Amino acid sequence: MGCVKLVFFMLYVFLFQLVSSSSLPHLCPEDQALALLQFKNMFTVNPNAFHYCPDITGREIQSYPRTLSWNKSTSCCSWDGVHCDETTGQVIALDLRCSQLQGKFHSNSSLFQLSNLKRLDLSNNNFIGSLISPKFGEFSDLTHLDLSDSSFTGVIPSEISHLSKLHVLLIGDQYGLSIVPHNFEPLLKNLTQLRELNLYEVNLSSTVPSNFSSHLTTLQLSGTGLRGLLPERVFHLSDLEFLDLSYNSQLMVRFPTTKWNSSASLMKLYVHSVNIADRIPESFSHLTSLHELDMGYTNLSGPIPKPLWNLTNIESLDLRYNHLEGPIPQLPIFEKLKKLSLFRNDNLDGGLEFLSFNTQLERLDLSSNSLTGPIPSNISGLQNLECLYLSSNHLNGSIPSWIFSLPSLVELDLSNNTFSGKIQEFKSKTLSAVTLKQNKLKGRIPNSLLNQKNLQLLLLSHNNISGHISSAICNLKTLILLDLGSNNLEGTIPQCVVERNEYLSHLDLSKNRLSGTINTTFSVGNILRVISLHGNKLTGKVPRSLINCKYLALLDLGNNQLNDTFPNWLGHLSQLKILSLRSNKLHGPIKSSGNTNLFTRLQIMDLSYNGFSGNLPESILGNLQAMKKIDESTRTPEYISDPYDFYYNYLTTITTKGQDYDSVRILDSNMIINLSKNRFEGRIPSIIGDLVGLRTLNLSHNVLEGHIPASFQNLSVLESLDLSSNKISGEIPQQLASLTFLEVLNLSHNHLVGCIPKGKQFDSFGNTSYQGNDGLCGFPLSKLCGGDDQVTTPAELDQEEEEEDSPMISWQGVLVGYGCGLVIGLSVIYIMWSTQYPAWFSRMHLKLEQIVTTRMKKHKKRY
C-alpha cells in the first residue's frame, strides 16, 4: 500500500512539473511587458480614426484600439496583438495594424527593446510625421515589417537593409517618404530573401535596378518617381504574381516579345500612367494566369489590341484614358470577366451588341466614347451587374426594362445622352448612385427611387421630368447630392427635404416651376455646401434658418419672387463664396454694419434686378477680403473647387462683359459685383478701388451721382465696367487708361463731361460706351475737345505725322532750287568740256542717280 502511495505521489509531482514547465514560458518576461506598456503610453487612441482600413490585399479590416486590453494584471502574451514564443515566452510578433494609435514615434522608443521580434505590423495608424528610426535595422530576426499608411515621413534609413531575413517589407505611404537614390540598389542587394516589396508613393526618383530578389511574388512601386527603361528581367522573375508600376509617368516599359518566365505565375499587372513602348506583343497571349490588367492612361491607340483577347482567365480589364478606336469586339471568350473599363477613349464607336455574350460582368464603364444607337433590349444574362456607366455617348431610345430589373444594381450613370421615355421602377434595393441627367426623360420620379436606404447621389437634372416632389424624398436619409434642376417639377418644396438628412451637401432644384415659400428648416449641424433654387416661382422671405448652413459656399435664390429686405445675416456664413439674389422683389436699403467679418470670402455678389434703395452698401464692400487680393501663384485657370465636381456642376447665372451667362463652372479668379437695376443713390464709394481682384463691376441702371472714383485705377485686372444709366457727373478719370485688361466699358447715359482718356484699351471702345453724355468729347466721338484742332483723333494724328514726313516743297524752295541748279549745271558743263573728262561726269551722274533712287524707295515704304 505504501508503495502504491509512493508511486502516485511521484506521478503527481511529475505531472505538476510537466504542467508547470509547459505554462511557465507563456509568462511574458517582465522587462518586455514593461517595454510594451511604455510604448502604449506614448500614444493616444483616436476614436475618430477611420472605422475600416485596407490591408495589403485590398480587403477592409475593422479598426479597433488593440492596446486598450494591455494592463499589468495579465501576461503580455495574452494581450491583443502580442504573440509570444511558445517555448521561451519572448515576444516575437506585434500586430497593431489599424489600432487608432496617434502620436509621435520617438527614435528611442521602448519598442526597440523587443529584440526577438520576427513580425512587426504598425500599419494604418497616425504617427503624425515621425521619422523612421534607424533602430528598426536592429531587429535582426525580423521577417515581416509593415509601416505603411502610418504617416511616417522623411528618408527611409539605410539601416533597413540590415534586415537580411526579411520576407515582407511594406513601407508605402502618401505622407512624404523617400529613399536616397543611391541607397535603393544596395537595399535590394542585401534583402535577398524578399517575397513582398511595397514602396508605393515613396519617392525613389531613380532608374529601376535589376537586382530584385529572385523570390519576389509581389512588387509594388506605384507613384515612386521611377524613370528610364524598366529592366526586362523584372518580367522574368519566375515567382512573380503581382506587379504594380502605376503612376510613374517617366518610366518606359517595353514588354518582352518572347514568353515571360513569369507568364505562368503573374496574376495582377498594373501599369496605369506609364509609357508603353511599341505595341502590345503576342507574348501577352501566354499570360494564362492573369486575372487583373490595368493599362489605363498608357497612350494605347488604334483598335483594342488582339493579344488582350487571348487572356481567357481575365477578371478585370482596365483600358481607360487611352486613344482606342473602332467598335468593341464581341466578348464571348471572356467568360470570367467581371470588370471592364474603357472610359474616355473618345473614339470607340459602334453599338452595344457585345453585351449579350457576357454573364459574369459586375462593373462596366464605357463612358465618354462615341457609342451610338439604343441599348439592346433583349439582354438577360447580366444579373450580376452592380455598376453600369454609359454616360457621355450618343446613345438614344428608351432605357430598356432589364436595367431597371437588375437585382443587385448599386450605381447607374446614363447621363449626357439622348435617352427618352419614362424612368421605370427599380427592382434593386441597394442603389447608391443614380445619374440620368441631361437626357430627354419624362414622367414622374419613381417611388422605388425615393425608398432607397443607401442612395447617396440622385442626379436627374436637364430632363422633362414633371409632377410634384413627393414627401417620400425625405426617406433618403443618406443622400449627399440631390439635383433635380432644369425639369418641369411643380408644387412646393417638401419641408422635410433637408430636416431629416444630415449628409446632404448639394441641393439643386433650380429652373423648375416650384412655388410657395421656402418653408424648409435648415437644421443645426447640416453640411450643405450648395443650395440652388433659382428660376422658380418661390415667394416669401429668405429663410432665417440658412444661418445654420455653416459650410455653405454657394447660395443661389435668383429669379424668383422673394419679397424681403437684404438678409445681412448671411454674411456670418464664413464659407460663402457665391451669393445670387438677382431678379426678386427684395427692397429697402442695405443697412451698414460695424461687423468687419461679414462676407469676407465672397467672390460673386449678384443683387441685380431688385428694388434696393439708399446708398451703396459701403460697409459690406469694405469687408470683401477675397476681392482685395490677386492670386498670381498659378498661371493655369482654376475653378472654385468642390469635392463632388466629378458628379455635379452647379448652374449659376452670372453677368459679365454686358452678357448673362449660365455658367456650370466658375473660375476661382472670377470676382464679380452686380448691383444693377436697383434704386441705389448717392456717390460711388471710393473703397471699391481696394477690391483689386475685381473682374466685373456692374452698377448700371440706378440713381448714382457724383464722380467716378479715381481709385478705380487700382482695379488692375478689371475686365468689365458698367456704370451706365445713372446720374454720374464730372470727367472720366484719366487714370482709367491704365486698366489694360478692360474689355467692356459702358458709361452711357450719365452726365459726364470733358475729354475721353486716350491710349491702350480706351482706343478700342466705340461710341456706344459714351452715348448719352452730351458733355463728353474726343475719340471715338465726332465732337472734338477744346473747339480747335489741338485735340485730334489717333487716326488724325497718324495722318499728320505722315504729312510731316512727306517731301512737301514750298514755292520759295522751288525758286531757290531752280536758281542753284542753273548755276551749278552751267559750271559743271563748262568744267567738263574744258577739262575733257566726260568719264568723270558719267561716274558722278551714276552715283547721284543711285542715291536718289535709294531714298525714293525708302520714302515709299513709309506709306
Swiss-Prot record:
Protein name (Swiss-Prot/TrEMBL): Receptor-like protein 9DC3
Domain comment in the entry: The extracellular leucine-rich repeats are required for the specificity of the elicitor protein recognition.
Organism: Solanum pimpinellifolium (Currant tomato)
Signal peptide: 1-21
GO CC terms in record: plasma membrane
InterPro entries associated with the record: Leu-rich_rpt, Leu-rich_rpt_typical-subtyp, LRR_dom_sf, LRR_N_plant-typ, RLP23-like
Upper taxonomic lineage: Eukaryota, Viridiplantae, Streptophyta, Embryophyta, Tracheophyta
Residues spanning the membrane: 813-833
GO process annotations (BP): defense response to fungus
The protein's role, per its UniProt record: Involved in plant defense. Confers resistance to the fungal pathogen C.fulvum through recognition of the AVR9 elicitor protein.
C-cap/acidic domain as annotated region, ranges: 760-812
Extracellular face residues: 22-812
Classification via Pfam families: LRR_1, LRR_8, LRRNT_2
Entry superkingdom: Eukaryota
LRR repeats: 91-114, 115-138, 140-163, 164-190, 191-213, 214-237, 240-262, 264-286, 287-311, 312-336, 337-357, 358-382, 383-406, 408-428, 429-452, 454-476, 477-500, 502-524, 525-549, 551-572, 573-597, 599-623, 667-690, 691-714, 715-739, 741-759
Family, as annotated: Belongs to the RLP family.
Glycosylation sites: 71, 108, 190, 203, 211, 261, 299, 310, 378, 396, 416, 464, 519, 563, 674, 698, 714, 746, 767
Membrane topology: Single-pass type I membrane protein
Segments in the Cytoplasmic topological domain: 834-863
